[in-house]
Amino acid sequence: MTTPQFGSQRSDDDNWDIVSSVGYTALLVAGWRALHAVSPRPLVRDDYAKTFIAASGDPYLTGVLANPGTSEDELAFPRLYGVQTRFFDDFFDAAGAAGIRQAVIIAAGLDSRAYRLEWPPATTVFEVDLAKVLEFKARVLGEQGAVPKARRVEVAADLRADWSRPLEAAGFDVESPSAWSVEGLLPYLTDEAQHALFTRISGLSAPGSRIAIGALGSRLDHDQLHALEESHPGVDVSGNVDFSALTYEPQSDPAEWLAAHGWVVDPVRNTLDLQAGYGMTPPEVDVKIDGFMRSQYITAAR
């Protein structure tokens, strides 16, 4: 099998909705969260995730949710994304407990934390993403009668451009501390775009601000994902998504960048570290996945 060229389906000004290109990966992750919610002993329950899948009409994800797997291999990616979801949930809970009242979810996708988490009074949650993605989420949650548990503000913007101005125009206060999440975004950015993203976040972050990042230390290699499915037949990584063609090879280390730009960075953890902290024993398939993805979960403060 020949590995597709990395980023071959991308361009500097490409766009997408929730069922195409990078947007579909948000739907895929929502599917994994929905599967994790119905698995034994879930770390988190995102009951909105299944509504996004139903509304999308995607045949692959609809079929998977209709007949969820039960083996360790079948639950591998739902389990790993359950761990990731818990990490970011805990981050925002801790930020709120510390008195931070501005949360910014970068590349919000189908994130439902504004509706799921128990936010302190007077908290504003800013969700930054492309307009088509935000419109889909608002429509689906509106049809469900969902009510956010904080003041939720949509910021329609391309994260490869200057999104800081739309954020400030939406009411973001640069003089007040903020909590930022960058979840599942970095593989889809070039190195230059990643630097620009962190530069803008740093420029908007008052003293006392915090950031949480989920990153990968290696590229999303098509051959490795295929080999994983061959060696663990229950694993179904992505349906027909070609991650190699949608992502770029990582060059910069986010933790090193933050440390060099005025952030105090906590010890970096991987998925296996998080699982241990949640009292879980990672199955062999999880160890293998993290062996080639080299996950990084980063928290830092100013």
Curated annotation (Swiss-Prot):
Pfam hit, one: LCM
Classification via InterPro entries: Ppm1/Ppm2/Tcmp (IPR007213), SAM-dependent_MTases_sf (IPR029063), SAM_mthyl_Trfase_ML2640-like (IPR011610)
Keyword S-adenosyl-L-methionine listed: yes
Keywords: Methyltransferase, S-adenosyl-L-methionine, Transferase
SUPFAM superfamilies, A to Z: S-adenosyl-L-methionine-dependent methyltransferases (SSF53335)
Residues annotated for S-adenosyl-L-methionine binding in this entry: D129, D158, L159
A single MF term (Gene Ontology): methyltransferase activity
Keyword Methyltransferase on entry: yes
EC number: 2.1.1.-
GO terms under biological process: methylation
Homology family: Belongs to the UPF0677 family.
Function statement: Exhibits S-adenosyl-L-methionine-dependent methyltransferase activity.
Protein name: Putative S-adenosyl-L-methionine-dependent methyltransferase MAV_2803
Species this chain originates from: Mycobacterium avium (strain 104)
